């Protein structure tokens, strides 16, 4: 099956009458233009994202009758911080940005994919990070696709 656009998002509808099949898209794949995946029910899915918009949790990629194929972003190990004041918020953003770490937000938690050296660096600079399994669905701007820039002087 080849999919070229998002039809709608499941948050907008009642799922009770639908037969839902999920395709897992990792947080770092949501902006890829071409993906090849296997759905939970074993259906091979080709996704051609020509409009460049990031896929979101709950996006419906295909529907036929009462059957739908829905994007699911799996949980992954994350570094989580809950800044208690503006100083901690600034320090967190500075340290993560300095390492080009993707930053996500959920309520009052800032999250980035788990990386032991980053965890140790955050502890060393006086912050209180902890490890937690999270869905990275709400990016806080910046670099999601792994591209970086250089600091040539």
UniProtKB/Swiss-Prot annotation:
One of its GO terms (cellular component) is cytoplasm. Keywords: Chaperone, Cytoplasm, Nickel, Nickel insertion. Coiled coil: none annotated. Gene3D superfamilies: Urease metallochaperone UreE, N-terminal domain, UreE, C-terminal domain. It holds the Pfam family UreE_C. GO terms for molecular function: nickel cation binding; unfolded protein binding. It is found in: Cytoplasm. It comes from the Bacteria. SUPFAM superfamilies: Urease metallochaperone UreE, C-terminal domain (SSF69737), Urease metallochaperone UreE, N-terminal domain (SSF69287). One of its GO terms (biological process) is protein-containing complex assembly. NCBIfam families: PRK13261.1-6. Involved in urease metallocenter assembly. Binds nickel. Probably functions as a nickel donor during metallocenter assembly. Belongs to the UreE family. This is Urease accessory protein UreE. It comes from Acetivibrio thermocellus (strain ATCC 27405 / DSM 1237 / JCM 9322 / NBRC 103400 / NCIMB 10682 / NRRL B-4536 / VPI 7372) (Clostridium thermocellum). The gene is ureE.
